[in-house]
Amino acid sequence: MRNKKNIIITLLLVILMFTLTGCSKDPEDLVRPITGFTEFWDIFVYPMAGIMWIVGKTIGFGNYPLTIIFSTLIVRTIAWPIYGKTNDMQLKMQLVQPEMEKIQKKYEGKDDETSKQRMSMETMQLYKKYGIGLGGCLMPFIQMPLFIGFYRTISRMPYSIKEAGNWIGSVFKTTQIFGIDMVLQQNQGFNELGEIIEATGWTNQKIGVLVLAILVGITQLISIILSNMRQKKQQENQVSDIPEYRRPKQTEQQQMTAKTMKFMLYFMAFMMVMFVWQSAAGLGLYWVVGNIYSTFQSWLGQVGTEKRLEKLRKKQMNKGRIQ
């Protein structure tokens, strides 16, 4: 089960990576003003742009950087219930893991069709017992349209602001914060940093974008490290009452999966830094705020993890379902 979960997460990261790099029919999709429906992702872009329009008109005071900050917090908060459902599903998976391992051990080495069907049936009964459904596995997918839509909105916003009379671009009266213009773009692709600086010299804008890129990398790495620490602690708690010599060891496949996951996560952090360097500065601000808020969100969720886990245990015991 853990391998399946890791595979799902890996697929999510791969899909997200290809989407963020703008893999679409038209490479110009991310450099168009937000006007008219011309691609599938516009379904998600316009609601996000609408949020930014409202924020820019009200608490953003026509300030584009402030609007990015407030809008990011609002969108992440909207997705918070989905995060909570995902976290609860992870807790249930912790409860089910010992019984799941018993089923796997029971049918270990049995490749006949009858054994496979029985194992599948017992697994489904176990999931039903703990209230685990397919919907819980789909929760991360539900978040993705929100975040991808907002990413594409931020990417296209500079072109909307530059377009005269654009419905959302005209809302913003200023696009700078701390001397950094959030709509300017490096337009240097993935060229080496030294060559860019040598050619154009150090400017406040380039220093600011570089700082944002570094902050994106740092905040993303902190989020990854803290997540790994939480996962390790949860795994240790799960087998804390089992003597060390009886604790299950990771298989070679599980170790390879874990290494692949770590590589994907760190590679994602690196790519985010590169995207910020070659994109408008607003993207960097969006990711920094999003990373910090997500880390806080995860920490806040961790605070109540043990209480929710204990509550789930008691609930199952009261129903007489835990032997």
Q: Where are the model-predicted features located?
A:
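Helix-loop-helix
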Residues: 2-15, 19-323
